[in-house]
Design a protein with these regions (language model features):
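Solvent-exposed residues in well-ordered beta-strands and their adjoining turns
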Residues: 39, 109, 186-188, 329
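Loop-rich catalytic cores of soluble enzymes, especially ATP-dependent carboxylate-amine ligases
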Residues: 140-319
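Long, repeat-rich segments with strong aromatic
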Residues: 287-300, 314-356
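Conserved, mostly hydrophobic/aromatic
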Residues: 36, 183, 326
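Terminal catalytic/cofactor-binding subdomain
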Residues: 1-172, 177, 211, 322, ...
Length: 465
């Protein structure tokens, strides 16, 4: 670590840690950020902007949950282009415009249980499907736009998205077609780095079981997870996917992120392209090469949060919510829409037992305790496995005999200990493992038999609600 910057990184780490609770108040809560491709009658990316008025006037006919049925939605507008609607916020759930005009994000939670999450999520999804149906459109349980390629024309007209396209080029435009299934799980301050490391280490487990994007731009790719595979060797691939090694602590986390280029800088409400290493931004813009005990200049921490927001590793800590965000899953098939959320929560709840198993199974003999960061000896094998499962899914050789079954069993036991019966939601994953076929492998077979229209037909959410 750069000696002149160490105190700066340490100070930023202290401020970052303060956004997480000293201890959790009861069982972990879970939230969900689920992205869905929406396609028009021809199967091409629709324009989400046409859905807002239909969602606003749509009547909620879903059953009330404990959190209440649909409350009125409030329009959220872009800070720069105030004519642009970027989302609709309600008490139980919200909708948000995504990078691509044809992708919409559903946000639900935090919820006390997966069943509470499922109830609110289903209400939001039913309302979305009804609105899309009025235009003859389809909402897909799939991880990418199946027919429309990533283009600048598909980019949502948020000012910051244009700035990111200017600096990242094709790597940013890729996000105009992708659709992930993410979860937010609350974590305490003391465990934050350990959970972050573990969440990244589990990326290949999630991809193996939940990849669902082999068909992109109407063509069959070589990957079960096309949305992950595209970024492995991309120019900005270091910002995406599984990290190269575990972080020793939060100071190390800040230091590692600071060695990446800052993509944006703030000028009033606008975000403009940047490009310098964030460590240089700290030094040149904030005089951040401080001596011990010197206070950071105003705006330094906000600049770090802006930088951190545009790094998309498989797991990342979110100061706004005090959570770990888990990101590797593609959007799931419409008949198994809770599978990834259940897996995410089970992994976090079972972290200690799963980590102990992984270390025993994968760490080279005699190396388990040599590194200051737990599980670092397992990292190279899991990184290799990550690349294999992106390509081959559950056909990839496991890093140890029965590896996935053991991890899934430990996640299941962890959910069972919560006492809500949530472990039932892992049933689709057990079926996938038994068949050795994840959704991406299944979609590959559908495409080979029925083409891209067959893929859209089996991914159509309306058929399963």
């Amino acid at each position: 670590m750069e000696p002149s910057q160490h105190n700066v990184y340490e100070s930023l780490a202290v401020q970052f840690a303060a956004h997480f609770p000293a201890r959790l108040q009861g069982p972990r809560t879970v939230g969900r950020e689920a992205e869905f491709p929406v396609v028009d009658e021809a199967g091409r990316a629709a324009d989400i902007d046409r859905l807002w008025p239909l969602l606003l006037k749509g009547e909620d006919t879903a059953k009330s949950s404990e959190r209440g049925s649909l409350s009125p939605l409030k329009v959220k507008r872009d800070a720069v282009n105030t004519d642009l609607i970027v989302g609709l916020d309600g008490d139980s759930y919200s909708y948000a415009l995504e990078v691509g005009k044809g992708t919409i994000e559903l946000n639900v939670g935090p919820c006390a249980t997966l069943f509470e999450l499922e109830s609110a999520f289903r209400s939001a999804l039913e309302r979305l499907v009804r609105a899309a149906g009025q235009l003859g459109w389809r909402v897909l349980g799939y991880g990418v736009q199946p027919l429309s390629p990533p283009t600048r024309a598909l980019l949502s007209p948020k000012q910051r998205y244009g700035a990111l396209a200017d600096i990242m080029g094709a790597d940013w435009l890729w996000y105009t077609v992708t659709a992930s299934d993410q979860a937010q799980v609350d974590v305490s301050r003391a465990e934050a780095v350990s959970v972050l490391n573990f969440g990244n280490l589990m990326a290949p487990v999630v991809v193996a079981l939940c990849a669902n994007s082999p068909v992109v731009a109407g063509e069959l790719t070589d990957d079960c997870s096309g949305r992950e595979g595209r970024m492995i060797d991309a120019p900005y691939g270091q910002r995406h996917g599984m990290i190269d090694r575990p972080y020793a602590d939060l100071t190390d986390f800040v230091a590692c992120l600071s060695r990446l280029p800052a993509l944006l800088r703030r000028e009033g409400e606008r975000l403009l392209p940047e490009g310098r290493l964030f460590s240089d931004v700290l030094r040149e813009d904030y005089g951040a090469a401080t001596s011990e005990g010197a206070a950071l200049s105003s705006g330094c921490f906000d600049a770090f949060l802006l930088h951190d927001h545009y790094i998309w590793h498989s797991a990342r800590l979110r100061t706004a919510y005090g959570t770990v965000e888990l990101r590797p899953a593609c959007q799931q098939p419409p008949h198994e829409l809770m599978a990834a959320a259940a897996l995410y929560l089970g992994l976090v709840e079972g972290r200690e037992e799963i980590a102990a198993y992984v270390e025993a199974a994968l760490a080279p003999a005699g190396e388990e305790k040599e590194d200051s960061a737990p599980l670092s000896a397992c990292w190279p094998r899991m990184k290799h496995y990550h690349e294999q499962v992106i390509r081959a899914g559950l056909a990839a050789p496991e890093p140890a005999p029965g590896f996935l079954a053991e991890v899934l069993a430990l996640a299941e036991a962890a959910l069972a200990r919560r006492g809500y019966g949530e472990e039932r939601m892992l049933a689709p994953l057990w079926r996938r493992l038994e068949r050795r076929e994840n959704p991406g492998q299944w979609v590959r077979r559908v495409f080979e038999a029925e083409g891209v229209e067959g893929v859209m037909e089996v991914s159509d959410v309306e058929a399963y609600l």
